[in-house]
Amino acid sequence: MAPMGIRLSPLGVAVFCLLGLGVLYHLYSGFLAGRFSLFGLGGEPAGGAAGPPAAADGGTVDLREMLAVSVLAAVRGGDEVRRVRESNVLHEKSKGKTREGADDKMTSGDVLSNRKMFYLLKTAFPSVQINTEEHVDAADQEVILWDHKIPEDILKEVTAPKEVPAESVTVWIDPLDATQEYTEDLRKYVTTMVCVAVNGKPVLGVIHKPFSEYTAWAMVDGGSNVKARSSYNEKTPRIVVSRSHSGMVKQVALQTFGNQTTIIPAGGAGYKVLALLDVPDKSQEKADLYIHVTYIKKWDICAGNAILKALGGHMTTLSGEEISYTGSDGIEGGLLASIRMNHQALVRKLPDLEKMGH
């Protein structure tokens, strides 16, 4: 006889037991999932270009904290880049051919920098999507902890936290920009870069020069440690372009701006953006415009785009379109970057340079 005179049928007992087992299973499976996540057993990415997409329930992240970690990541990656170059053991190999037919080179500097940068950011912000140039090998996974200290120069410029949904954030990492020049020991062109985009728009960028140990950073509507120069020459500009197609751009530039125009061949997109700014680095050349006419990857340009945008400058395709940092990892329409100039007037003035890159 059941208590209180209630009689339980065999069917009722079975239903009650099944409900109890269901509750226990739900609780236990949730506990196990949490433990697997804690110890990194939940499937770290093995893909070359991207980490896992952000979870829909990832909460929020603080852009000020992301800036601090991005600066640290760029510096840590730069330490690896410098160490490998100074050892003179690069383990250089080709990943294939670029669209222009050149070797797409990779070195130990690329790989080791990528590992430090990716896992520092991924450990600090596990719920955001991270896109990186090099393959992320799960066998080389590291847990690299951030001490949650924000540098004073960032606190001075960005005085309050800036929370955004984690699912809106995409991080773009270039662990070694100007690999070709790196293999040639042309050190001044080499940078490491981190960019954070929110809903596809670049909002913070970091460009670090490992061999001079100079770091530029900026946050849109936040602050920066770098500034524009006091003046630019719009009539006969100095134009910084890739070493591989300087002749192609020079011909058009002379026709457009006249014989006094100067073409500066250079390696690395990060270096070229810094050429437009007031950078206290004696090895850094100065330019008024940055033009690129061929296909380029977003991790090459996102950080520079964010810095220019934060300082009131512009980076667009050659036809004047804004660049979205979601979806595919490259853009076809070439680049025009400027600051303190009439950017759209420059777009209209230039001929269809993008067609020359094909």
Curated annotation (Swiss-Prot):
Molecular function GO terms recorded: 3'(2'),5'-bisphosphate nucleotidase activity; 3',5'-nucleotide bisphosphate phosphatase activity; 3'-nucleotidase activity; metal ion binding
Q: What is this protein called?
A: Golgi-resident adenosine 3',5'-bisphosphate 3'-phosphatase
What class does this enzyme belong to in the EC scheme?
hydrolase
Write out the catalytic residues in the record. 110 (proton acceptor), 179 (proton acceptor)
Q: Which organism is it from?
A: Callithrix jacchus (White-tufted-ear marmoset)
Q: Which GO terms describe its biological process?
A: chondrocyte development; embryonic digit morphogenesis; endochondral ossification; phosphatidylinositol phosphate biosynthetic process; post-embryonic development
Gene that this sequence comes from? BPNT2
Q: Locate the region Disordered.
A: 85-106
The pathway to which it is assigned is: Sulfur metabolism
Family assignment from sequence similarity: Belongs to the inositol monophosphatase superfamily.
Q: What is the lineage of its organism?
A: Eukaryota, Metazoa, Chordata, Craniata, Vertebrata
User: Is Magnesium a UniProt keyword of this protein?
Assistant: yes
Q: Does the keyword Lipid biosynthesis apply?
A: no
